[in-house]
Amino acid sequence: MKPEERIVKARMKNSNNWIKGYYIYDSTNKKHFIYLLDNSAIKNELTEIDETTLCYFIGLKDKNKIPIYSNDIVIIDNEPDYEYFIVEWNTDLARFVLNGDTYMVDFDNYNSTDCEVIGNKVGYPEYDFLNKHIWSI
């Protein structure tokens, strides 16, 4: 795997700001960090993250050349039904898949350039994209 394919993104701890870099877990202090990339706001520095927002780059880009991460919400251009898909890791298949509300597909069935990233489910915890409604709290 190339180094650029190991990139993750997450929100900074106690912030809504997203950062990208390399994931590091400090097992002694039980803290999660990202070693920031040069193009980040803060350069070459460890920044603590909210581990619940951690998203892994899957090594592919969408039709707009946007990197695709786990937990991204995508639509597929050539789908007859307008459906949202969530990019998720499937342990049984040992690969990232597109999980929709009616079916699941993998990137063997679709070219990533047929997909468009429209958001990330981490950014919209109150919205159930697969069932297309606001969760009642």
Task: Mark where each language-model region is.
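Secondary-structure transition motif
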Residues: M1-I137
